[in-house]
Amino acid sequence: SLGYPVICLDARHAKAALSMRINKSDKNDAQGLAELARMGWFREIKVKSMESRNIRARLIARAKLVDLRRDLENQMRGLLKSLGIVLGKSAGRTFSKKIINCLGEVPDLHSLIMPLFSVHSTLIEQISQYDLELKDFSRSDPTIKRLMSVPGVGPVTALAFISTIDDPHRFNRASDVGAYLGLTPRRYQSGELDRTGRISKRGDSLMRTYLFEAANVLLKIVRRGSPLKSWGTKLAKRIATKKAKVAIARKMAVILHCIWTDGTQFEWSRNAS
């Protein structure tokens, strides 16, 4: 309201600069931050819009409920396994059906499993409610529909990408998105030593998870051929499958950024490669 610009500093850079001081105190920190601002030795970070933060909050809440649901499923599966009952791989509503069948066959387990199962059923309903809200967001936004044209990318992944990037034009190159999301390998070079390590894992961990899951869907579930799927399949044969999925996730991030900025859709033809 006073007309002053609001600038947010990169906390990692500020911490590295302030760590040079011998004594840590609020006074020294305030003086150090003032010196950084005066000299301009700081990296400014993007302040996301309220809409992006609103979507992001829903995605985080949904992810937490999914984690709780998985933990409960593993807990019930472990309890039943200790009693000689093996449920096998399943999740969500399929897991609920197996639990109901199990309780029908062995009524004595009702007092043991039913309290956990009731919480599990509530979590499923709440996750479904979040899914409906996110789908409503995706239907009203043409950009999200175009992002969903990429094989393996659903409404949750598309919304997560929109809320994480917020402004696609702040990247000079589409390849910078991969580094921003922590999907590029770290590099250490000194003299004759030049070593490439694992991915940096900087940035949004939830977005990386969604892109990795999208890459997994592309390789294992999507049947329709595309240049992206062909490239990923060949890469998975040459290197470890997990590394290939990370590479596909990085390429997906670049493709999503290009689709967002160009106003195009995913091209399935060979000419698109």
What do these predicted ranges mean?
Residues Y4-R53, A57, F95-L103, L193-R202, ...:
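Short alpha-helix plus adjacent loop in nuclease-associated cores
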Residues K81, I85, K89-L103, H169, ...:
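HhH-family (HhH-GPD) DNA N-glycosylase catalytic core used in base-excision repair
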Residues A34-A37, L59-R62, V66-R69, E73, ...:
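Short, amphipathic alpha-helical segments that act as regulatory/interfacial helices
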Residues W41-R43, L72-E73, I127, D166-R170, ...:
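Short helix-capping/linker segments at secondary-structure and domain boundaries
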Residues R146-S149, P155, F161-T241, S273:
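Phosphate-backbone recognition surface of nucleic-acid-processing proteins
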Residues A236-S273:
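Basic, amphipathic alpha-helical segments enriched in Lys/Arg and hydrophobic/aromatic residues
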